[in-house]
Structures are given as C-alpha cells and as structure tokens.
Design a protein with these regions (language model features):
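Extracytoplasmic
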Residues: 21-176, 641-780
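Flavin (FAD/FMN)-binding glycine-rich loop and adjacent Rossmann-like elements that form
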Residues: 176-181, 297-302, 312-320, 324-643
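Sec/Tat signal peptide C-region and signal peptidase I cleavage site
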Residues: 16-20
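N-terminal Rossmann-fold NAD(P) dinucleotide-binding loop
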Residues: 196
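Beta1/beta-strand and adjacent pyrophosphate-binding region of the FAD-binding site
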Residues: 181-193
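Conserved N-terminal/central alpha/beta ligand/cofactor-binding core
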Residues: 208-209, 214-294, 339, 346-349, ...
C-alpha cells in the first residue's frame, strides 16, 4: 500500500480510555461549523483538512462541538494553528481567535505564533464529564485550526514536526491499520471537476458500475461556485461532433467570472446530472490520499480515501481508475512517470467580488497585507449584464438562474489575480493561496483609503478561499502531444477530443511585477499559435492513459501533453470531453478484457463507433445494446463562433475585405466575430480602410463591430468619410461595443455610387486596434 507520508487520520471527536490523559479533537469534526469553512486543499502540505474563519474582515460565527471527558481533572489545552502571514515576514497576525471551554474563553489569543503549523498552548481548563468547545474568531481574516489536544500531563509538549504529529494523531484516534473496502467497481473516478464528471457519467451510461470521488462538497472543480472559473472550449464539433453533449448537460451559463451570484455556476445541476445515473455511487467530501497496488502487476487495486467531515477511511476497489484530480495525484501515488515544471509554470487564482451598498462601509487596517498603491494593480472591473459575455455558451440554453438585478453595482477581480509562477506547484500551494489573500486584501485597502469617494460604499462580498490552479503534474502516456502538431494540423489515427482554445499560457504581467518581483500577483495571457477554432484539433486518445500503470486513465489538465499543448487543452469543456472518451474506453476495457493501451492497439474502431454515438445513449448492462432514452435531454444547436455576414442587413465590410496598411494579425479568440476571424494591431502607423458605396443616396447609420479585451485600444481613432466630409470619433475597444456586438459611429449622408470609407488608425489608440466588420444600414 502506498500512502502520502503526510497523512492522516480519522476525523472524529473521541476519547479512548487507554489514552485517557490525552484527548484529540479534530476541528473538522465540530458538529456546528458556524461561519468557519472547511479547507481541504492542502492536506498533502500540512497533514489534514482544517477550519478557517474566512469572513473577509468580519468576525464569523463560532464553530462549536461537545465532548465527553471520562477522567476529570485539570487539562492543558493545545491548538494546532498557524500565523498565516508569518512566512512572508509580514507585520502582525490577522487570523486571531480563541478557544472557549464551557462558554469561557481561554487566556491565550491564538494564531499569532511561528512561520508554520505548530501547537499553541491555549490555556488550562477544569474538565469533568460533558464539555462544550467553541472556536471564537476575532478578526474574520482567515484564522485557521487543525486540531485541539487536551492533556492532563502538564509537562507534555506535542510535536510540531509533521510526521510526528500525524503519528500522534493516529495513535490517539485509534485508527485501524487497514481501512474497510467497498465492493469492486468497474470504474473508479477520482476528482469531481469537468473531466471527472464527463468520465463518470459517460462510464455509467455504458453500463459500468462507477465510484465517483470528489474531495469538496460540490462538483465542478474550478467551474464550481467555490472557484467560479467559467468553462471554456468548443464542444460538439470536429471528427466526433457528439463529444461534448454530456458536458453541455451540466456546464455553466454564467454571465461573468466571477459572478455577482455564485449560484450562476449551478452546483445543483451538476449534482443532479450525476445522481441521475443509477449505476454510479457519488462520494463527496472524500479525499484520496493513497493507493493500494495489485500484487502481481503494475496496476492499482484500490485508492484510499477519507471523508473530510466524518473521518471515515475507505478503500475504493476497482478494475480501472481515472485520475481527474488536476494534480495527477493518483498517478504519482501509483508510481507513474509524470512531467512538472518546478518554476516558470502557470499560477493559481483566487478571484473576488465587491458590491456597492447604500451606505459607507468601513474596512479594517491591514498592515500585514501587501502594501499597495492604486497603480500597483488593475482596478476591479464592473460586471457586464447577462448576455454580453459568454454569449455562445448561453445561446438556446436555460441559464439555470435568475439574473442578478443592478449588475452595475458589482465589481470583480478576475482570472488574472494569479500568483505562484515560480513556487513549487504542490508543496507551496498554501503559501500561494495566502499570498493571493494578501494581494486582494491589500488592493481593497488601497481602494478604500486612496480611491476617493468611488469606493466608499463598496463592501467585499466574495473572495475565493478555494484556489483555481492551472498547472502541476502531467502524467506521461503512450504519446506526449506537442503544441506544434496542433499548429501544423497533424492528425493522429486516434485523434478525438477537439481542442479549440489557442495555446494560452500565463506569465506575470510586467507592469505590476516591479514592486513584488519575487512573487507577482497579476498575470497576462500569452496566446501562442492558433488552433482550428471551428473544428478543433483532435487530441489523441493515447494521451489519456498512463504508459506505466496498466489500469489508469487520466482526463483534464493532467493528461500527457507538453506545456504549449497544455495551454490549449486545459480549459474545462475540453477536459470534460476527455472524460467522455475515457468513460467509453473503460467500457471497452471491461467488456473485452483489455487495457487502456489495448483499446488503441486492438479496439480503436469500437471506440470510434462509440464516439460517434449521441452522448445520451446508454445501455442497461455491460452486454446490453445502446439505446436513446425517451426522456433524453435535447440540446440546442451549436452556436456559431462567427456571425454570417450574408445574413446581416445592410452593407457589411468584413476585416478580410479591408485595405490594411502595416502589420496586422488575425485572431479568433474573442467571440463572436463577423465572418471567419478578426484582425488586430498596435503597430505604429498601421491603418485599415473599409471602403464601400451605397446604391441609394441618403442618411445611413454606420456601425463598428468588435469584442472587448483589456489590451484593446482605449482611444482608437476612427474616421468616417462621407458626403458631409471627414469626421473622426474615438472608440474604447477595451469595453464592449454594445449588447449586439456593435457600436454606432454616427449617422451620415452618402451619395449613390460614390466611394466612402471608414478608416481605423493605430496611432494614439492606447492599445491594440480591433478590426472585425463595418455595417452600413439605412437610417430611414
């Protein structure tokens, strides 16, 4: 059996007579968490889930529990905690709290010591029989608690070293050496993000018995309400246009990322989609921390998980396993070869939301946060009304939520609040998250103290305490896909999942990296070579299983790709389609007694046939025939990335018909666009002339189409040449052109047959000039 050396324990409030002088209480086992949240992200880093007072500057309600003491007496009370800003040599201790016993706070204020997790002596208490414990937050700034230890031995000092702490934990909790096991499942899926959901649902619809394991209380991973990254990537296209149909049954239709209301990410819909599969067992709040290998082969026999709320340990036995953890955790525990950049990788984001209230809101001083000036970070942006962003993923679908009124009252810090580029992508994750906290709190402090009246009435409504990582381990398969194959369009015989996202890697944004060069917290997206956005590049099946472990699949950002390719494949709708393919391949493995590699070598035609079937198709048994249920969810047609100029009224001059001067690049990333692409440039002296002639003299409205981006020009000069003469207006292309994708440049007089034009220039634009299309329509 292989276990993470940092692990762990059953999380029970319990007393054992054989160790009556010492009582261990896991914070996670408190019966009422109050306003404290359960953090499970860093179990491999610090040894346990823990509770955190994430009140964003407002004290949270007490976490409470009751224990029974069998030996009365005077107990020394220890609490395992951390001053979370101390590793940064920051001033103060923001996460202060106390432990209350029977309504009486102990003398020591906790969360103030050390640079790592350690035991702080909270005080002493006279205990006899029943005792009520409470964690009393003092600040709302992320105080954290792993465990409480009571001892009658006044000379006992619990160990701070992690391995010794966990040895003590296991001894005092009386953990069995071997956890009980489940029945044997056909497929065990570990990780409940989009890739895991795709694999679990797809496998269940093929008649497999599926154990679906997720270490959070909700499904969706980065696409859940806890993280609020909207799911990107084109589905239902390419070689196998039915791939993605399962994903679209549960994908979000959010208006913003993050949104004014986290409910836009529709956790309920995701759970309903999973629970609708009768052959699947869902295990939420279960963290996999170990594997048990088969004795006679390099295969996994079971994965070992613990319930992060009740502490129950379980071995999940299966024939085949899917690593959808995002970190390649199962593969690494099993000994699979993997790739990982220790430095120079993409970071982790913790996004945030502000809301304007009807009165002034005070904000505490934060001397421990990053000392920021207004120019040290991008100001949070106003949210857009429903339908301006993410429109393609909304078209034809039930949104699944009621749009938030008064959207203009919300501001948000988006995906680019990202750090950890040169930090170890696994061991340093808690430090990365906490650095993000310091950046966000420091930014809000700057807005409050230096932003004038604009931010007086704003309050912090939401800050993700669960981070959204982008890159860590990638398990090596029989093929490592490189980015150049995508660009060249090299199609492999097992190409299947269409990846449509351009090769998008993140780096520190130089403008904001000057003050904190060792750990920048604002990123920029660098788009490399383009992929075929219309049809997608088909990612090979051989990237979806381990070359070393005979029964291990993977799906999501942990598949077998090099970094440039990862920049394209990592987005969530694409990851979900990988899961769909893996679920089908797992059925072939079970039904035909083969391996993931054997599917490619012997049964590829069967896999191709399955990928050509609608996602709603299912079979009731392993041997049963596929059929389409009468109640199968009907999906709307795929919304086009581009607007068809032939279907638009008036005169349409697309960017490909414009007369371009200077260096212009083509793009497809900002959707929707008119025609097959758009063009953009910031080259000095570049220009674009959209020439046209009307058939009838008269007054015409002139419209310019574009999609916004932060790097687009804020003052783009646009000249309209008409019978009235030349008029120049400026366009802010960093903002949306309008709900319909265009901005009216004005109404002008044009003479029939006379050449007129709209001219864009880069000089003075303050960013990239975006060319999509000009529309000239009668003003009658």
């Amino acid at each position: 059996m292989k276990l993470s050396r940092f692990l762990l324990a059953t999380f029970l409030t319990c007393v054992f007579p054989t160790h009556a002088q010492q009582v261990w209480i896991e914070a996670e086992s408190f019966t009422n968490l109050g306003g404290w949240v359960l953090d499970t992200q860093f179990i491999e880093v610090m040894g346990s889930p823990y509770l955190m007072a994430h009140g964003m500057g407002k004290q949270v309600k007490n976490a409470e529990t009751e224990i029974t003491i069998t030996e009365p007496g005077t107990y020394t009370v220890w609490v395992r905690t951390k001053n979370w800003v101390a590793p940064f040599d920051a001033e103060g201790a923001p996460g202060k709290f106390q432990l209350s016993v029977n309504g009486q706070p102990l003398e020591k204020v906790l969360g103030t010591e050390g640079k790592d997790w350690l035991w702080e002596k909270a005080g002493h208490a006279e205990l006899n029989g029943s005792a009520k414990l409470a964690l009393v937050d003092q600040t709302g700034f992320d105080g954290r608690v792993d465990a409480v230890l009571l001892t009658r031995d006044a000379s006992f000092n619990p160990p701070n070293e992690l391995a010794a702490t966990n040895t003590l934990r296991r001894r005092l909790l009386g953990l069995p050496e071997k956890a009980p096991e489940t029945k044997s499942y056909d497929l065990v899926v570990v990780g409940g993000g989009y890739s895991g959901m795709g694999a679990a649902i797809s496998g269940a619809r093929q008649g497999l018995s599926v154990a679906f394991i997720q270490n959070r209380p909700v499904l969706g991973g980065n696409g859940s309400s806890e993280v609020q990254v909207w799911a990107m990537g084109g589905t239902r296209r390419g070689l196998y246009p039915h791939l993605g149909e399962i994903v679209e049954e549960f994908a979000d239709r959010s208006s913003n990322s993050p949104a004014a209301d986290p409910a836009e990410f529709n956790d309920k819909l995701k759970e309903e989609a999973v629970k609708g599969e009768k052959s699947m067992d869902l295990f939420l709040n279960t963290h996999v921390y170990g594997v048990e290998m088969a004795k006679d082969a390099k295969k996994i026999r079971s994965v070992i998980g613990l319930d992060t709320k009740t502490g129950k340990e379980t071995r999940f036995v299966g024939q085949f396993f899917v690593d959808c953890t995002g970190h390649g955790s199962v593969g690494a525990l099993a000994g699979a070869e993997f790739m990982m950049e220790e430095k120079g990788h993409m970071g982790m984001s913790n996004m945030w939301v502000l809301k304007k209230t009807d009165q002034a809101v005070t904000w505490p001083t934060t001397p421990w946060a990053l000392p920021l000036e207004l120019e040290d970070f991008p100001a949070p942006r106003a949210m857009e009304p429903v339908g301006v962003k993410n429109k393609l993923n909304m078209t034809g679908f039930d949104l699944g939520y009621t749009p938030t009124p008064n959207m203009e009252e919300y501001l948000h810090g988006e995906w680019f609040w990202e750090s950890g580029f040169d930090k170890q992508p696994l061991k340093d994750l808690e430090l990365v998250r906490d650095h993000n906290f310091r950046a966000v709190y420091g930014a809000f402090s700057a807005l409050k103290s230096k932003g004038g009246e604009k931010y007086t009435n704003y309050d912090m409504q939401w800050l993700a305490y669960i981070g959204g990582p982008r890159e860590s381990r990638r398990i090596v398969g029989d093929m490592i896909l490189n980015g150049e194959d995508m660009v060249k369009g090299l199609i492999h015989p097992d190409g299947c999942v269409p990846t449509t996202w351009d090769q998008d890697l993140h780096y520190p944004k130089e403008q904001y990296a000057v003050k904190f060069p060792n750990n920048p917290f604002i990123s920029r997206a660098e788009f490399g070579k383009h992929t075929d956005r219309k049809n997608g590049y088909p990612v090979p099946y051989r990237c979806f299983y381990s070359k070393d472990i005979g029964n291990l699949f993977m799906a999501g950002r942990t598949i077998s790709v090099e970094r440039q390719a990862l920049g394209s494949t990592r987005v969530m709708r694409t990851c979900g389609m990988m899961g769909e393919v893996v679920g089908k391949a797992a059925w072939i493995c079970v039904r035909h007694h083969t391996s993931p590699r054997g599917v490619y070598e012997q049964y590829l035609d069967i896999l191709k046939d399955l990928m050509n079937q609608p996602g709603a198709m299912r079979r009731d048994t392993l041997e049963g025939a596929l059929y389409l249920p009468a109640n199968a969810k009907k999906l709307p047609e795929v919304a086009s990335d581009g607007l068809d100029p032939k279907k638009m009224p008036g005169i349409i001059i697309d960017d490909e018909d414009a007369e371009l001067t200077g260096d212009w690049k083509k793009g497809e990333g900002l959707k929707p666009y008119v025609g097959s692409h758009y063009s953009f440039s910031s080259a000095k002296g570049a220009s674009a002339r959209f020439a046209f002639a009307v058939k009838e003299s008269g007054r015409y409205e002139v419209r310019a189409y574009w999609q916004p981006h932060e790097n687009r020009g804020k003052s783009v000069p646009v000249s309209i040449l008409s019978t009235d003469g030349e008029k120049t207006v400026t366009a802010n292309q960093s903002k949306p052109a309008g709900k319909e994708g265009y901005q009216t440049l004005g109404t002008f007089t044009f003479k029939a047959g006379e050449e007129s034009a709209v001219i864009f220039r880069t000089d003075g634009s303050q960013g990239n000039v975006h060319l999509d299309a000009i529309q000239v329509i009668s003003a009658k």
